[in-house]
Amino acid sequence: EGILTAANTCTINDGAAFVMLASERWLRERDLVPSAEIKGFSMIGADPAVPPLSADLAVSLLLRDKGLFYSDLDAFEYNEAFAVISAEFRKKHRDVADRLNRWGGALAYGHPYGASGAEIMIHLMKILEREEGKRGVAAIPAAGGVGEAVLINNVDEREWTEERERHT
């Protein structure tokens, strides 16, 4: 129960970010190492009256489809345009609450339109890299009750290089 107000929503900021998607073949042909590998994606429509909750619903769907549990993930990056997103996550997933938005979320650093998805994906990739995590989810609620989630695995540069050498 509660009300969304300017006091518990993020600010709108200017910003820019990008994430490059490439095939494994393209990367190997250019001797490049990816930061992460996409393992799954989900999109869900939820109650448009409570759009902030749609991100976690998308994550639940994705994990169910992949046969995973919240405890199988090392990090969660949710675009928390509203404080209720973090509050609800911490209430529902107490055992993994410390894995959500470790570097802060949109309430802390703002909500740059057009860059939010790339921004949370970059945060997730860097958190997994620095903390030697293996798997994480980036999720975002969108207007009209749409929720989207992406599951990624961290790519270990040494393992990637060794695999490349085995195939050459």
At which residue positions do the language-model features occur?
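Claisen-condensing/thiolase-fold acyl-transfer catalytic domains that form or cleave C-C bonds
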Residues: 1-168
